[in-house]
Amino acid sequence: MPNNEPPQEESSTFVRPKKQKDWRVVAIRIGVIAAVTVLVCLFILRPMVISGGSMMPTYSDKGFTFGFLPYFKIYAPQRKQVVILKHAGFNTFLLKRVLAFPGETVEIRNGVLYVNGKELDEPYVKYPCDWNLSRREVPKGKIFVLGDNRSMPIQNHMGGMIDKSRLAGVPIW
Protein backbone atom coordinates (compact mmCIF):
# COMPACT_ATOMS: atom_id res chain seq x y z
CA MET A 1 0.00 0.00 0.00
CA PRO A 2 1.35 3.32 -0.96
CA ASN A 3 2.38 5.67 1.75
CA ASN A 4 0.37 8.89 1.41
CA GLU A 5 2.12 10.68 4.17
CA PRO A 6 4.38 13.48 3.10
CA PRO A 7 7.99 12.64 3.43
CA GLN A 8 9.45 13.83 6.68
CA GLU A 9 12.61 15.85 6.57
CA GLU A 10 15.45 14.49 8.46
CA SER A 11 16.10 16.59 11.46
CA SER A 12 19.69 17.48 11.58
CA THR A 13 21.40 19.96 13.75
CA PHE A 14 24.46 21.78 12.61
CA VAL A 15 26.82 22.53 15.42
CA ARG A 16 29.50 25.09 14.68
CA PRO A 17 32.78 24.24 16.18
CA LYS A 18 33.91 26.77 18.77
CA LYS A 19 36.32 29.24 17.27
CA GLN A 20 39.56 29.21 19.06
CA LYS A 21 41.73 32.25 18.60
CA ASP A 22 44.97 31.19 17.15
CA TRP A 23 47.69 32.88 19.20
CA ARG A 24 49.63 33.58 16.03
CA VAL A 25 46.78 35.65 14.57
CA VAL A 26 46.55 37.66 17.79
CA ALA A 27 50.32 38.20 17.84
CA ILE A 28 50.31 39.37 14.20
CA ARG A 29 47.46 41.80 14.87
CA ILE A 30 49.24 43.24 17.90
CA GLY A 31 52.47 43.51 15.90
CA VAL A 32 50.75 45.34 13.03
CA ILE A 33 49.03 47.76 15.43
CA ALA A 34 52.32 48.43 17.22
CA ALA A 35 54.21 48.99 13.95
CA VAL A 36 51.56 51.39 12.62
CA THR A 37 51.56 53.29 15.93
CA VAL A 38 55.34 53.64 15.89
CA LEU A 39 55.36 54.83 12.27
CA VAL A 40 52.60 57.38 12.92
CA CYS A 41 54.42 58.69 16.02
CA LEU A 42 57.77 58.95 14.22
CA PHE A 43 56.67 60.46 10.92
CA ILE A 44 53.20 62.03 11.24
CA LEU A 45 52.01 62.89 14.76
CA ARG A 46 54.92 63.03 17.14
CA PRO A 47 54.14 63.46 20.85
CA MET A 48 56.39 66.11 22.40
CA VAL A 49 57.10 67.35 25.90
CA ILE A 50 58.09 71.01 25.92
CA SER A 51 61.27 71.78 27.81
CA GLY A 52 62.19 75.38 28.46
CA GLY A 53 60.44 78.70 28.69
CA SER A 54 61.33 80.42 25.40
CA MET A 55 57.74 80.12 24.10
CA MET A 56 55.95 81.18 27.30
CA PRO A 57 53.12 82.02 27.78
CA THR A 58 52.00 80.40 24.50
CA TYR A 59 53.57 77.05 25.46
CA SER A 60 54.63 76.40 29.03
CA ASP A 61 57.67 74.53 30.27
CA LYS A 62 56.87 70.82 30.80
CA GLY A 63 53.78 71.20 28.60
CA PHE A 64 52.69 68.59 26.07
CA THR A 65 51.79 68.83 22.40
CA PHE A 66 51.67 66.76 19.25
CA GLY A 67 53.72 67.82 16.25
CA PHE A 68 52.23 67.40 12.78
CA LEU A 69 55.44 66.62 10.92
CA PRO A 70 54.38 66.48 7.23
CA TYR A 71 52.90 70.02 7.36
CA PHE A 72 55.70 71.71 5.38
CA LYS A 73 55.56 69.07 2.66
CA ILE A 74 52.08 70.50 1.92
CA TYR A 75 52.12 74.15 3.05
CA ALA A 76 54.57 77.04 3.21
CA PRO A 77 55.34 78.68 6.56
CA GLN A 78 53.31 81.78 7.46
CA ARG A 79 54.34 84.87 9.39
CA LYS A 80 53.60 84.56 13.14
CA GLN A 81 53.10 80.79 12.82
CA VAL A 82 54.55 78.60 15.57
CA VAL A 83 56.79 75.96 14.02
CA ILE A 84 58.79 72.93 15.10
CA LEU A 85 62.47 73.08 14.15
CA LYS A 86 64.94 70.21 13.92
CA HIS A 87 67.76 70.73 16.38
CA ALA A 88 70.81 68.64 17.25
CA GLY A 89 69.68 65.30 15.97
CA PHE A 90 66.63 63.16 15.47
CA ASN A 91 64.96 63.51 18.88
CA THR A 92 65.48 67.18 19.73
CA PHE A 93 63.14 69.84 18.39
CA LEU A 94 62.55 73.53 19.11
CA LEU A 95 59.33 75.54 19.07
CA LYS A 96 59.70 79.04 17.59
CA ARG A 97 57.59 81.63 15.81
CA VAL A 98 58.22 82.59 12.15
CA LEU A 99 58.66 86.36 11.88
CA ALA A 100 60.42 87.17 8.59
CA PHE A 101 61.23 85.63 5.20
CA PRO A 102 64.06 85.80 2.64
CA GLY A 103 64.64 89.31 1.30
CA GLU A 104 62.97 91.01 4.27
CA THR A 105 64.85 93.07 6.84
CA VAL A 106 64.56 92.56 10.59
CA GLU A 107 65.59 94.82 13.43
CA ILE A 108 64.88 94.90 17.16
CA ARG A 109 64.93 98.29 18.92
CA ASN A 110 64.28 98.39 22.67
CA GLY A 111 62.49 95.05 22.45
CA VAL A 112 60.25 96.00 19.51
CA LEU A 113 60.58 93.91 16.34
CA TYR A 114 60.56 95.71 12.99
CA VAL A 115 60.15 93.87 9.69
CA ASN A 116 60.97 95.96 6.61
CA GLY A 117 61.08 99.05 8.84
CA LYS A 118 57.53 98.56 10.19
CA GLU A 119 56.71 97.49 13.73
CA LEU A 120 55.30 93.97 13.77
CA ASP A 121 52.19 93.59 15.92
CA GLU A 122 52.96 90.73 18.33
CA PRO A 123 50.04 90.27 20.76
CA TYR A 124 51.47 86.90 21.89
CA VAL A 125 54.55 88.60 23.44
CA LYS A 126 53.52 89.13 27.07
CA TYR A 127 56.94 89.64 28.64
CA PRO A 128 58.68 92.75 27.25
CA CYS A 129 62.41 93.11 26.83
CA ASP A 130 65.01 95.70 26.00
CA TRP A 131 66.84 93.79 23.29
CA ASN A 132 68.53 95.48 20.38
CA LEU A 133 69.44 93.77 17.14
CA SER A 134 70.86 95.79 14.27
CA ARG A 135 69.01 95.83 10.95
CA ARG A 136 69.81 92.83 8.76
CA GLU A 137 68.37 91.12 5.72
CA VAL A 138 67.10 87.55 5.83
CA PRO A 139 69.20 85.62 3.25
CA LYS A 140 67.78 83.32 0.60
CA GLY A 141 66.91 79.87 1.98
CA LYS A 142 66.52 81.15 5.56
CA ILE A 143 63.74 82.48 7.78
CA PHE A 144 63.88 84.56 10.95
CA VAL A 145 62.37 82.96 14.08
CA LEU A 146 62.17 83.85 17.76
CA GLY A 147 60.48 82.56 20.88
CA ASP A 148 57.57 84.44 22.47
CA ASN A 149 59.22 84.92 25.88
CA ARG A 150 61.34 87.97 25.16
CA SER A 151 62.13 88.56 28.85
CA MET A 152 64.85 85.92 28.52
CA PRO A 153 68.23 87.34 27.47
CA ILE A 154 68.71 87.23 23.70
CA GLN A 155 71.77 85.00 24.23
CA ASN A 156 69.50 82.30 25.71
CA HIS A 157 67.26 82.13 22.64
CA MET A 158 68.00 79.60 19.93
CA GLY A 159 66.44 81.59 17.14
CA GLY A 160 67.35 84.19 14.58
CA MET A 161 68.19 83.24 11.01
CA ILE A 162 67.67 79.53 10.42
CA ASP A 163 67.70 77.34 7.32
CA LYS A 164 64.23 76.60 5.97
CA SER A 165 65.36 72.96 5.75
CA ARG A 166 65.18 72.82 9.57
CA LEU A 167 61.38 73.23 9.51
CA ALA A 168 60.04 69.94 10.85
CA GLY A 169 56.31 70.61 11.34
CA VAL A 170 53.78 72.49 13.44
CA PRO A 171 52.36 71.90 16.91
CA ILE A 172 48.72 70.83 16.86
CA TRP A 173 47.79 72.61 20.10
Residue ranges and their predicted role:
Residues 1-173:
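Extended hydrophobic leader/signal-anchor segments used for secretion and membrane insertion
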